[in-house]
């Protein structure tokens, strides 16, 4: 009640005050109107030529304006410049765009670009001259073009190709800040874009830029990091050293050379490798790197290259911006600096598109806008110090998000350095350790990061947002960084494209940047050099593909291992459950399938056709069983692959238990080509595993089809823990989630860790006094129908794949499984070694899905697809 009384007493006072304010405002408003009218009338009475304006009078020594103001070069020293001298005569020489004030200006020799009436004739107009000064619709405001044909002006017989890189532009930026980037967002809307483009590992600037113009993995083209040492050259490479211009570092054939070798000209405005005489040649036109050159000047120069006479004009161009990478390092990916940088690069990109439109090239040029990698936030309290693991640091370390360790004394100790001991000392040391140490050959095969002497043998795979460094003296933390696992969402890069060759208003699934080189060759209609990409896998980006892929032709034909005798000629295998030859003959007779049974098992267990063998001189035969089919390699004495289909769990009864300690010889395989059971003695670290799991059989009798020597593969005992858990638990889970899966699995031999199948002589080197070679890896490819209402064997459309390439090692130290059940680490281990079907093909010499009724280019999309499990950014 007291507060209400107080309020009532104050109201009269407030009303009086309000009345005074109203009167004061009315008086001020009246005065403002009078002053405005006075100024307007006063100015209106003066003649324009006596206003003292420098418009069209800049640096005219004879001009005298109002009160004798001047516009000549010395007016500032005299202090008699006209009021608009700075804006008209000085500022106009510093900007790259027109405005209404500049339109029709007197030509200024010092201008960056011109808005004078004769600029079109003299080819020095600012990029937006037509839209600002002649009233044409700007590129940004123009509707998306939907013409099916190229709209090139006279003199442009074929569309030029512009490759534009914005360093460190992570894909998420375009989703989060799209409204702040109207020009780039329009390109995304009108053209084609991927959800993201995957960078190669390590996700660094030089390796990925060179990969983009090469189609090669860093291990193949030699630029394996921004900083590296080559023991053969005995030199160090860094971004700040002159060594980066030494052609000895740069292997392969970059895009500009591919174009030049086939009669085209190429121009690069900054690109890693363009300043080195690779194969003895530079690009037709190139600019030495200078980070201080304004983005607008770079764009203006590229536009001038497009103005060159036809005989001199390049067909292929590159453009490079350091942003938003520079700002991302300084402030982190979520910062005001990055937002400002995105606006700057968007403005510069808009200048390019406006300049193209002014030349009527905006629907003629094929332009690709991409990035080399993304950006991750780092923190100074997320650092792993090697001094916490070693009492003394006696090695050299490349620090950061993708660390490598080598000998400190080089070249003397380079090859003798004990890398294995370093990895052991860094493995499973802490429960909350934020990196995994690897010997480089043991890294996930999908990375293709091993076969190069510049890749040091010790590698640390670091958790997101963490850095690994030598000691606490390293304070280079905070802000942003990159180089991490290329599956991290923060490392995802942008890819957008627009032009007469590209589809419009389309989003495509992610792909890897090794595929861009082949795409650019197709745009230029030239033949690519050999590369790691899969030619034709990006045909779905194009309106009319230039290259039509076909399935690889099989190199080694198969035979059928025939059934001759129901009893083995000789055998050292035992199966106590088969007590006499009659029982043995009965189960062996099950291997003798009729043609109808063969047709039935092929339909279910090879729904996409058998894998074709692309290795030379491989003697192999097909072995048919009711529950699986395998391709048996006679020289290796083991199956090269086995294929079977696991139905959805609800479609089958509980599986019968497996008969223990039962093995017998496969009577279809001669003893000279078969494994012996005595090979797997208890005193060895090797035991036998089954490529097709006997427990997957639907009846107790049919499991005997799997308990045979032709289904055996050698496995380390520790590896079988992981292998068995996958087949008994995870495989059932995947089949349940996907309405059944087709499984193809087999051994891999990659002793020289080059990512390709080993030749027989390479395998023979590693037999170690045994007749059976030990695989370096095993692969598993799960295939299901993308439409989960269909099973694999009756899938009418697109397929889904889940391939794994699992290292075959004596220990499971990678997963630190001590005291943990398999449920806590096996699935994570498989996930860490996810791969593409194409990776499996390269490592096995097999070719998949040849009988799937689908265009080959779509099959290649499937083969180059890499499943990911990352959700955090």
UniProtKB/Swiss-Prot annotation:
This entry's Enzyme Commission designation comes to 3.1.4.1, 3.6.1.-, 3.6.1.9
| Residues where Ca(2+) binds | 750, 752, 754, 756, 758
A Gene Ontology BP annotation from the UniProt entry:
negative regulation of inflammatory response
Q: Which residues form the SMB domain?
A: 51-93, 94-138
The active-site annotation reads 205 (nucleophile)
Summarize where Zn(2+) 2 binds, as residue positions: 325, 329, 482
Entry membrane topology: Single-pass type II membrane protein
Q: Topological domains (Extracellular): residue ranges?
A: 31-873
* Identification of the protein by name: Ectonucleotide pyrophosphatase/phosphodiesterase family member 3
């Amino acid at each position: 009640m007291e507060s209400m009384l107080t309020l009532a007493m104050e109201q009269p006072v407030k009303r009086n005050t309000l009345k005074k304010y109203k009167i004061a405002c009315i008086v001020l408003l009246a005065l403002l109107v009078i002053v405005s009218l006075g100024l307007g009338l006063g100015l209106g009475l003066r003649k324009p030529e006596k206003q003292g304006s420098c418009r069209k009078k800049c640096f005219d020594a004879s001009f005298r304006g109002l009160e004798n103001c001047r516009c000549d070069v010395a007016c500032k020293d005299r202090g008699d410049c006209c009021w608009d001298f700075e804006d008209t005569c000085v500022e106009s020489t510093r900007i790259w765009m027109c405005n209404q004030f500049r339109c029709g200006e007197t030509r200024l020799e010092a201008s960056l670009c011109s808005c004078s009436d004769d600029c079109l004739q003299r080819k020095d107009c600012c990029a937006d001259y037509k839209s600002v000064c002649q009233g044409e619709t700007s590129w940004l405001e123009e509707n998306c073009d939907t013409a099916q044909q190229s709209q090139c002006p006279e003199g442009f017989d074929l569309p030029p190709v512009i490759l534009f890189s914005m360093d460190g532009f992570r894909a998420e930026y375009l989703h989060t800040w799209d409204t702040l980037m109207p020009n780039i967002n329009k390109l995304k809307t009108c053209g084609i874009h991927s959800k993201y483009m995957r960078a190669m590992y390590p996700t660094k600037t030089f390796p990925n830029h060179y990969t983009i113009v090469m189609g090669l993995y860093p291990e193949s083209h030699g630029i394996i990091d921004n900083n590296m040492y080559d023991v053969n050259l005995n030199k160090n490479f860094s971004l700040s050293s002159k060594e980066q211009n030494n052609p000895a570092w740069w292997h392969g054939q970059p895009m500009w050379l591919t174009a030049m070798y086939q009669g085209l000209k190429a121009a690069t405005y900054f690109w890693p490798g363009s300043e080195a005489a690779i194969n003895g040649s530079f690009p037709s036109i190139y600019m030495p790197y200078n980070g201080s050159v304004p983005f607008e000047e770079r764009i203006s120069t590229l536009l001038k290259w497009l103005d060159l006479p036809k005989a001199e004009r390049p067909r292929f161009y590159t453009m490079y911006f350091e942003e938003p990478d520079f700002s991302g390092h300084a402030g982190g990916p979520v910062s005001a600096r990055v937002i400002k940088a995105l606006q700057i690069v968007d403005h510069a990109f808009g200048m390019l598109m406006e300049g193209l439109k002014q030349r009527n090239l905006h629907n003629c040029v094929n332009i690709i806008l991409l990035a080399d990698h993304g950006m991750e936030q780092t923190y100074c309290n997320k650092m792993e110090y090697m001094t916490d693991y070693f009492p003394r640091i006696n090695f050299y370390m490349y620090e950061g998000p993708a660390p490598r360790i080598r000998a400190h004394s080089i070249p003397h100790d380079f090859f003798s350095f004990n890398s294995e001991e370093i990895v052991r000392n860094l493995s499973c040391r802490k429960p909350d350790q934020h990196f995994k140490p690897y010997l480089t050959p043991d890294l996930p095969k999908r990375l293709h990061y091993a076969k190069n002497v510049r890749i040091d043998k010790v590698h640390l795979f670091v958790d997101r947002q963490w850095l690994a460094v030598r000691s606490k003296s390293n304070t280079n933390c905070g802000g942003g960084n990159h180089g991490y696992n290329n599956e991290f969402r923060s490392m995802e890069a942008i890819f957008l494209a627009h032009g007469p060759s590209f589809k419009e208003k389309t989003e495509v699934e992610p792909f890897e940047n090794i595929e861009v080189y082949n795409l650019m060759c197709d745009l230029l209609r030239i033949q690519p050099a050999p590369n790691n990409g899969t030619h034709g896998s990006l045909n779905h980006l194009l309106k009319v593909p230039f290259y039509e892929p076909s399935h690889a032709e099989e190199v080694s034909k198969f035979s059928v291992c025939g059934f001759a005798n129901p009893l083995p000629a000789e055998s050292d295998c035992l199966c106590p459950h088969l007590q006499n030859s009659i029982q043995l003959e009965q189960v062996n007779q099950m291997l003798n399938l009729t043609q109808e049974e063969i047709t039935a098992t092929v339909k279910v267990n090879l729904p996409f056709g058998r894998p074709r063998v692309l290795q030379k001189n491989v003697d192999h035969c097909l072995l048919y069983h009711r529950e699986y089919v395998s391709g048996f390699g006679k020289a290796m004495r083991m199956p090269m692959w086995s294929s079977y289909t696991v139905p959805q769990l609800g479609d089958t009864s509980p599986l019968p238990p497996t008969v223990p300690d039962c093995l017998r010889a496969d009577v279809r395989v001669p003893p000279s080509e078969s494994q012996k059971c005595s090979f797997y003695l208890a005193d060895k670290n090797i035991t036998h595993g089954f490529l097709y799991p006997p427990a997957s059989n639907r009846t107790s009798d049919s499991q005997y089809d799997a308990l045979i020597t032709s289904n055996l593969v050698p496995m380390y005992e520790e590896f079988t823990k992981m292998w068995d858990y996958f087949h008994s638990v995870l495989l059932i889970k995947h089949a349940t989630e996907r309405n059944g899966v087709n499984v193809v699995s087999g051994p891999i031999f990659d002793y020289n860790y080059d990512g390709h199948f080993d030749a027989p002589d390479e395998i023979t080197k590693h037999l170690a006094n045994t007749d059976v070679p030990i695989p370096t890896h095993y692969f598993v490819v799960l295939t299901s129908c993308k439409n989960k209402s269909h099973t694999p064997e009756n899938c009418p459309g697109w397929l889904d794949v889940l391939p794994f390439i699992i290292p075959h090692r004596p220990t499971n130290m990678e997963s630190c499984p001590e005291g943990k059940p398999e449920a806590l680490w096996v699935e994570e281990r498989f996930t860490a070694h996810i791969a593409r079907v194409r990776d499996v093909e390269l490592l096995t010499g097999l070719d998949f899905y040849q009988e799937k009724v689908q265009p080959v280019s779509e099959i290649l999309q499937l083969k180059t697809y890499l499943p990911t499990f990352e959700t955090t950014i």
